[in-house]
Regions:
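Class I S-adenosyl-L-methionine
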Residues: 1-103, 114
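A contiguous loop/helix-start segment that scaffolds small-molecule binding in enzyme catalytic cores
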Residues: 3-5, 73-74, 151-244
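Fold-independent oxyanion-binding glycine-rich loops
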Residues: 8-12, 33-35, 52-54, 79-81, ...
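Class I SAM-dependent methyltransferase SAM-binding "motif I" and its flanking Rossmann-like core
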Residues: 12, 84-152
Length: 244
């Protein structure tokens, strides 16, 4: 049988793809982080739903692999896209011991693109996505990536800017960026994408340093071509300049 690693998209499921919905309908078992299982529980009352808490990712993926290897179609659900800070890579790594198991990754809408749509069009040119979580990546590595992305004039999208224990990571990241970029650089944040309390704000890099982010926040730092147009964050692709 098959293990499907499924992206639920943003929020409570309104942004889920038709492919993802079809897979969840077809699978006998749905596995995921407790909060994500709760998002789909009402829609799939007749499925077997299995969940594990935060920081039990290895256990969760092994559970899904074992159930699929036993002959069932299993869906491992992730928020956003399973290949962007999701469970796709871990499932594929752990499945090395099950070479006969078929694994399919079902893409979803990630916070970078869903958040960008709420702000306007900040990702229309080259961009870098960086997580500020240092749980699995040393902070020194994160700082180096931030600095290099700023020097290269990428638009930067930040995932995981804060948590209950990581309250100052966004400020520290802004300090790194401010060593390369002006405080007036256009930025934006989106909170609770697709959920109650959804919010999109546009301000400067200097103002971003003082912003109180949480684990449901996605941050955008513009490049030299990023402007605020009618309260929307817009990065030029260059078409108008080509016509001049």
């Amino acid at each position: 049988m098959t293990l499907y690693v499924v992206g639920l998209g943003p929020g409570a499921g309104a942004g889920m793809t038709a492919q993802a919905r079809a897979v969840l309908e077809a699978c006998q078992v749905i596995v995921g982080y407790t909060a994500y299982i709760n998002l789909v529980r009402a829609d799939y009352p007749n499925k077997e739903l299995l969940s594990t808490p935060m920081r039990s990712e290895v256990e969760r993926c092994r559970m899904a692999i074992e159930r699929a290897a036993s002959g069932e179609d299993v869906a491992m659900v992730c928020s956003g896209d399973p290949g962007v800070y999701g469970m796709a890579s871990l499932c594929l790594e752990l499945a090395e011991d099950h070479p006969a198991l078929d694994i399919e990754v079902i893409p979803g809408v990630t916070a970078a693109t869903s958040g960008a749509a709420l702000l306007g069009a900040p990702l229309t040119h080259d961009f870098a996505v960086i997580s500020l979580s240092d749980l699995l990546t040393p902070w020194e590595t994160i700082e180096r990536r931030l600095s290099c992305a700023a020097k290269a004039d990428f638009v930067i999208c930040l995932y995981n800017p804060a948590s209950r224990k990581r309250t100052d990571h966004l400020r520290r990241a802004c300090d790194v960026l401010l060593s390369e970029l002006p405080a007036t650089r256009c930025c934006g944040v989106v909170r609770n994408i697709g959920r109650e309390g959804e919010q999109a704000l546009v301000f400067t890099l200097g103002e971003l340093r003082e912003y109180q982010a949480d684990m449901f926040t996605t941050v955008f730092i513009g490049n030299q071509q990023t402007r605020v147009i009618c309260e929307r964050l817009v990065t030029s692709r260059g078409y108008l300049q080509r016509e001049d």
